[in-house]
């Protein structure tokens, strides 16, 4: 597979059991340590199952709800993430919890644009060539518009991947793009595989964030970059109160009206409030081994982009 999967660490057993294999649980296994699901206290096993069910329920309306909840601003946040990444042709990206492909599609657009600019600059430097030679060179370069860049979208939820694949087909994305069912806490990729690891609005839904960060570090090449876009903690007290009011009073209602699912969006709101603040997440990223870790608040900390390097 183009994703560079480890054959020795097969994701699913031949006899099935895909959901339990991915969630890291099995019938008969001890429930494990206690954690939280929104404001509820649950076992780790129960949390994994509940979160899987949330995204199974919302997958079909996920993109519509993102636009409705954020008034479309999530698109700007994702654009900022990809511009911060600044990928060049040849970059190999893994987008974990990539679901419906928003980051992957932006990555491919960005790389294609960079590649086109490079080609135009190259042709301007060869003005002494005949038009036949210029045309031949242009056609050869155009045959590889991504410059060997690839993005692997990895998500634990098959319904989210299904929605992403359908969107990719509708929008015409295929080259340089692959989809993998996988768990952020136990990625089935080789060590030192990727140039960039992204996770956008996904890490707060990971039960063991420490394990996910360790896996991110493992699969990145030396010099590789970790980028995380996530809802965070608002620094402005007035905005924080207004944000809480909107989150708890409006978002679940939108979930019910648009997706027919109040409970899933109530969880999503609660999960944001239970997520570690910016400095705490920064420390966790550093504990996983990353260096030069920093973060950028957007919209007064409604979301933050954390960045770190494997050096």
Curated annotation (Swiss-Prot):
Record's catalysed reaction(s): a 2-methoxy-6-(all-trans-polyprenyl)benzene-1,4-diol + S-adenosyl-L-methionine = a 5-methoxy-2-methyl-3-(all-trans-polyprenyl)benzene-1,4-diol + S-adenosyl-L-homocysteine + H(+)
Any one Pfam family match given in the protein's UniProt record, by short name: Ubie_methyltran
GO cellular component terms, semicolon-separated: extrinsic component of mitochondrial inner membrane
Transit peptide feature range: 1-29
Broad class of where this protein is predominantly found: mitochondrion
Cross-referenced PANTHER family: 2-METHOXY-6-POLYPRENYL-1,4-BENZOQUINOL METHYLASE, MITOCHONDRIAL, METHYLTRANSFERASE
UniProt-recorded name of the protein: 2-methoxy-6-polyprenyl-1,4-benzoquinol methylase, mitochondrial
């Amino acid at each position: 597979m183009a994703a560079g999967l480890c054959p020795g660490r097969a994701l699913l057993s031949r006899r099935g059991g895909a959901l339990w294999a991915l969630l890291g649980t099995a019938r008969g296994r001890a429930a494990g340590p206690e954690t939280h699901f929104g404001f509820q206290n649950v076992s780790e096993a129960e949390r994994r199952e509940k979160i899987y069910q949330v995204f199974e329920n919302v997958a079909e309306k996920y993109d519509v709800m993102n636009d409705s909840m954020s008034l479309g601003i999530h698109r700007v946040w994702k654009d900022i993430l990809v511009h911060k990444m600044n990928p060049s042709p040849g970059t190999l990206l893994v987008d974990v919890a990539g679901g419906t492909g928003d980051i992957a599609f932006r990555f491919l657009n960005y790389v294609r644009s960079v590649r086109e600019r490079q080609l135009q600059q190259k042709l301007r430097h060869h003005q002494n060539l005949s038009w036949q030679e210029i045309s031949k060179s242009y056609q050869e370069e155009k045959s590889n518009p991504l410059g060997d860049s690839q993005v692997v979208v990895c998500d634990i939820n098959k319904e989210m991947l299904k929605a992403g694949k359908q969107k990719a087909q509708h929008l015409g994305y295929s080259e340089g793009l692959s989809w993998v069912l996988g768990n952020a806490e136990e990625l089935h990729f080789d060590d030192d595989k990727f140039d960039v690891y992204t996770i956008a609005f996904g890490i707060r839904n990971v039960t063991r964030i420490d394990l996910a960060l360790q896996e991110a570090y493992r699969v990145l090449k030396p010099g590789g970059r970790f980028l995380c876009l996530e809802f965070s903690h608002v620094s402005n007290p007035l905005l924080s109160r207004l944000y809480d009011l909107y989150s708890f009073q409006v978002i679940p209602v939108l979930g019910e009206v648009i997706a027919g699912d109040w409970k899933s969006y109530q969880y999503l709101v609660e999960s944001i409030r239970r997520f570690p603040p910016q400095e705490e997440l920064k420390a966790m990223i550093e504990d996983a081994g990353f260096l030069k870790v920093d973060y950028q608040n957007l919209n007064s900390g409604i979301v933050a982009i954390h960045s770190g390097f494997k050096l």
